[in-house]
């Protein structure tokens, strides 16, 4: 749709490069984001800001017309970056809302409901795509565009409970921070240094990075490879649902 003037290889290549670039920027900025919010106690504010930017960018894709692949990639890349950056702060909230002995339970419940909610919306959107002729859509592309709008609205609705109920802890500043960005870099350096001195933590983080990078690669490129193999859209959707 957006890349109608591109070959399938070009479309896949540009999309993967966009994902790689946004993830690389996250890799560079993530430690600073974490340290910065630790210093000034602004996890909630920045999380909501990042998530709102992502919501807007995903919603804008609904209005992006055919052939506008550059605009689509830009909005997608921005949404991907700020979504992932927001997850850093979202994960930090866990240690603020419960005790250490309940971390695993609360985290597990959160992931379960997250997969259920995401899977439910994906199922609804898949039905819209497969049966667009029976609905109010003029073509299947219109159903896909509408799916981006539903994701944006869905995302916004489930942001509200956290935005309304959660409050950041007040950070007591013992001295005025002349340059909070410099302080965040210092804190990041201190954290990296402490990790490098602890072999077990270092190996765990390295293993997790390689594992999760593989998972994200499969998630982001599975549909592309399936399309290159000329698999039917219905078969791809069923495979993703399973």
Please annotate each region the language model reported:
Residues 1-4, 77, 193-218:
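Pair of pore-lining "gating" transmembrane helices in MFS-fold secondary transporters
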Residues 121-134, 152-172:
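C-terminal membrane-cytosol helix-exit motif in multi-pass small-molecule transporters
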Residues 1-12, 220-238:
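Short amphipathic helix-loop junctions that connect adjacent transmembrane helices
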Residues 27, 48-69:
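C-terminal ends and interior cores of transmembrane alpha-helices
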Residues 57-60, 67-86, 210:
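Hydrophobic core of transmembrane alpha-helices in multi-pass small-molecule transporters
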Residues 12-35, 122, 242:
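Central cavity-lining transmembrane alpha-helices of secondary-active solute carriers
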Residues 167-206, 228:
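Juxtamembrane intracellular "pre-TM" segments in multi-pass secondary transporters
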């Amino acid at each position: 749709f957006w890349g109608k003037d591109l070959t399938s290889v070009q479309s896949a290549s540009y999309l993967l490069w966009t994902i790689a670039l946004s993830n690389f920027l996250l890799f560079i900025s993530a430690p600073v984001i974490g340290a910065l919010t630790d210093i000034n106690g602004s996890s909630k504010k920045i999380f909501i800001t990042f998530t709102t930017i992502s919501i807007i960018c995903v919603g804008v894709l609904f209005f992006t017309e055919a052939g506008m692949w550059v605009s689509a990639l830009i909005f997608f890349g921005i949404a991907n970056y700020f979504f992932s950056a927001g997850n850093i702060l979202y994960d930090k909230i866990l240690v603020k809302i419960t005790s250490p002995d309940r971390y695993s339970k609360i985290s597990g419940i959160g992931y379960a409901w997250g997969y259920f909610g995401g899977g439910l919306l994906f199922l609804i959107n898949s039905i819209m795509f497969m049966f667009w002729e029976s609905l109010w859509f003029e073509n299947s592309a219109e159903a896909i565009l509408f799916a981006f709008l539903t994701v944006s609205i869905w995302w916004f609705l489930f942001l509200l409970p956290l935005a309304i109920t959660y409050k950041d802890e007040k950070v007591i500043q013992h001295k005025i921070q002349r340059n909070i960005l410099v302080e965040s870099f210092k804190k990041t350096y201190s954290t990296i240094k402490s990790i490098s001195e602890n072999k077990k933590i270092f190996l765990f983080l390295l293993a997790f990075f390689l594992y999760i990078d593989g998972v994200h690669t499969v998630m982001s490129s599975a549909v592309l490879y399936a399309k290159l193999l000329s698999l039917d859209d219905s078969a791809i959707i069923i495979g993703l649902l399973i």
